A protein has these predicted regions:
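Noncatalytic, beta-rich nucleic-acid-contacting surfaces in large DNA/RNA-processing enzymes
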Residues: 1-445
Length: 445
């Protein structure tokens, strides 16, 4: 699949998700991230204790993604390849409005309903009912009470179907032997969701379209055509001072992962000097870990302020100045301190992120016992466990961060060394957005 893409002028991303931590994937050319160089853990991708199926997600340039899917259909047969159905459900606000409309509520009442349901992800009608204003609306009259009861019964039911944005199933036998199928816009479509398809052993691969890969490819083609220069993105230097000057100045409009005002502000304060700085920024600038950005920047500029809970944590946290950023660091700490295998450490990481109290208590004792067997005192063992528990909820997969930071660096390199081609392609991709077009033109000047 990757070989076809690379030999048919379809740009492929350097890697995505935990699969970039696989040395086999790197050696086969599936990814272009060296897991030994970047200290990535294979066990984050696959380990003996993992009970769920691993998968390799692949980024293709968005303008040629369909070409790869067509290749798969031709190679394996149209009855062996399908997309995956997804179901939209009647969530609180949608079901409340739909039922109200059917019961003859006027537009004013429907708008009132929308305003009375709090804007909270995943909120239920029962939760909304706890709010005094909503409860008063429900009991305003008998019709409203009937509306509420009907809405609660319908809440959560499937509302409509659509197609999974990236998932493709490939099977060695015709899929109609395994799953109910229907016809989608571009071929077969399972009538089972991704979870149900995986449960019976069907292989799912995510074929994702990434606009930034299309931009990179177009720049490379145009530079070759106009200047007769072959840009080998696998051979560019990762210590280019001009690139880091660009990043330090916050001139990252149009750069993958780095173009928002917030990230640009962080880059200016951080003054990145190494590729690792880019990896850290792309991992930290998310809800949750953002609160650690000031600490990270302060310690980056003041190494004497870096502190570790225990000296044994220094080799693991040195590159991030004592701040836990990556999921792999949590696994390394569990291995170093408690003697966990990397498979056991991944189970611990998953338990922490899901916050299952029963499993967490079991894993806590497992960790403390292992740490004590390794010569750590009970108090420091508990402190280290609490430390990784704090960060586990939003630790970022380092393999993914390195992969996407590579795309960001490549775009920064092209912007510095081939600015005319960079701006021309970016402007072509923001047609229709006056704000983005104006920002790009201002920066280009």
């Amino acid at each position: 699949l990757i070989h076809f893409a690379k030999t048919h002028e379809v740009m492929v991303g350097p890697g995505r998700g935990s699969s970039a931590g696989s040395l086999v994937s790197y050696l086969l050319g599936i990814t272009t991230i060296d897991p030994l160089k970047y200290n990535l853990l294979f066990e984050r991708f696959l380990n003996p204790e993992r009970v769920t199926m691993p998968d390799i997600d692949i980024d293709f340039e968005d303008t040629r993604r369909e070409k790869v899917i067509k290749y798969v259909q031709d190679k394996y047969g149209e009855h062996h390849v399908s997309g995956i159905v997804t179901f939209g459900h009647l969530l609180a606000r949608a079901v409340a409005r739909d039922v109200g409309r059917i019961m003859g509520f006027d537009e004013t009442s429907l708008n009132e309903i929308s305003k009375l349901i709090p804007h909270k992800l995943g909120i239920t009608l029962e939760e909304a009912y706890q709010k005094p204003e909503f409860k008063a609306f429900v009991h305003r009259n008998h019709r409203n009470e009937r509306w509420f009861e009907v809405s609660k019964k319908l809440e959560g039911l499937p509302r409509h179907t659509s197609t999974h944005a990236a998932g493709i199933i490939i099977n060695d036998q015709p899929l109609f032997k395994f799953a109910p199928l229907t016809t989608g816009d571009t071929g077969l479509l399972t009538q089972w969701t991704m979870t149900e398809a995986e449960r019976i052993g069907l292989l799912k691969i995510d074929f994702l379209g990434l606009r930034n890969l299309s931009i990179i490819h177009q720049i490379i083609l145009q530079v070759k055509k106009d200047l007769n220069i072959n840009i080998d993105i696998e051979a560019i230097p990762y210590d280019d001072k001009k690139v880091f000057d660009l990043l330090s100045n916050g001139d990252t409009t149009g750069i993958f992962q780095l173009e928002s005002d917030g990230v640009r502000s962080v880059l200016k304060r951080l003054q990145p000097e190494h590729f690792e700085d880019i990896v850290a920024v792309t991992s930290l600038y998310r809800p949750g870990p953002m609160e650690e950005i000031p600490t990270y920047i302060t310690r980056r500029h003041n190494p004497n302020q870096v502190a570790y809970l225990h000296p044994d944590l220094e080799p693991i946290l040195k590159n991030t100045y004592g701040v836990i950023i990556y999921q792999e660091q949590i696994m390394l700490i569990a291995s170093q301190v408690a003697g966990f295998s990397y498979g056991e450490a991944d189970i611990l990481r998953r338990a922490m992120s899901k916050k299952n109290r029963a499993i967490l208590e079991s894993e806590r004792q497992h960790f403390i016992d292992g740490a004590k067997n390794n010569g750590y005192g009970e108090q420091i063992s508990k402190q280290i466990f609490d430390l990784i528990l704090k960060f586990a909820d939003y630790g970022f997969p380092r393999a993914h961060a390195v992969s996407y930071s590579k795309i960001a660096y490549i775009m920064s390199y092209l912007k510095v060394h081939y600015p005319h081609y960079f701006y021309a392609n970016i402007l072509s991709n923001v047609i229709g957005s006056e704000k983005k077009t104006a920002a790009m033109i201002d920066e280009a000047k």
